[in-house]
């Protein structure tokens, strides 16, 4: 098998940007990460973050990222404005705007900072789970983007064709191992996308498809570049759940840990659903 390294991996091709002027990049959306409506939201979020990561004025590393999916992203070319709104001694605030045909399709803000060594503590431990290699990979072909990820479910598999006689689950929680497929060394861009691999919580709660999608997400990065490098291309353990689904909208809270138990990402999002 050909080794997948950054730049020849499908993910890196999907988030690739070309500088086109001050605070401006250009890119292209193909169908390799296509979802129900437009591309997988995680790769769109990674594209916007990449604009800040590639910017010549960037300082520090990502601490938080908020993405708002304003409208459908179409196949084809786009422009990305990555604007450093304010740069302080060790912090930086960003405005990110993805545009197609002159209209904003995705907006975002990001907070970067230079981390200083301090006292640290992790209060949310990784749940107990069988090793990733002991679980079968779930092959899913409903959407193009599924092929780009390795999913190994511990619990909470969404299966609309289940035959256990239960039409619904009692909760919305999912616990799974996941990573890029083929494996790719973890970095901030790929962690951004992995933070959005969880299907809408209403799918899991009710075990059936319904029109649904993320409207806004916020990632909190708990790791630095060195910690991500230590995670390598191994699986991450992800846990996601909803706290309330009400009148067309649902939240989701999720976490991703490295296989040695380090919490790398906390993410929250709001999704719409229709009936």
Which sequence ranges carry the predicted segments?
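Terminal targeting signals and extreme-terminal segments of soluble enzymes
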Residues: 1-275
């Amino acid at each position: 098998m050909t080794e997948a390294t950054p730049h020849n991996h499908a993910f890196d091709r999907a988030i690739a940007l070309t500088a086109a002027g001050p605070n401006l990049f250009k890119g292209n959306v193909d169908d390799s990460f296509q979802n129900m409506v437009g591309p997988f939201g995680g790769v769109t979020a990674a594209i916007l973050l990449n604009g800040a990561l590639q910017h010549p004025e960037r300082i520090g590393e990502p601490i938080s990222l908020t993405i708002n999916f304003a409208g459908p992203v179409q196949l084809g070319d786009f422009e990305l404005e990555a604007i450093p709104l304010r740069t302080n001694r060790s912090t930086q605030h960003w405005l990110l705007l993805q545009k197609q045909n002159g209209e904003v399709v995705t907006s975002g803000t990001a907070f970067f900072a230079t981390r200083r060594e301090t006292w640290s503590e992790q209060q949310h431990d990784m749940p107990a789970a069988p090793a990733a290699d002991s679980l079968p990979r779930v092959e899913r072909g409903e959407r193009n983007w599924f092929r780009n990820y390795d999913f190994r479910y511990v619990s909470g598999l969404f299966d609309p064709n289940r035959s256990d006689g239960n039409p619904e689950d009692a909760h919305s929680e999912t616990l799974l191992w996941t990573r890029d497929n083929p494996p790719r060394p973890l970095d901030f861009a790929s962690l951004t996308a992995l933070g959005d691999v969880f299907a809408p919580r209403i799918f899991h709660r009710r075990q059936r498809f319904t029109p649904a999608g993320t409207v806004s997400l916020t990632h909190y990065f708990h790791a630095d570049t060195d910690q991500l490098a230590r995670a390598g291309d191994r699986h991450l353990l992800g846990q996601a759940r909803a706290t309330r689904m009400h009148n067309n909208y649902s939240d989701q809270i999720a976490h991703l840990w490295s296989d040695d138990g380090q919490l790398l990402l906390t993410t929250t999002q709001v999704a719409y659903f229709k009936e």
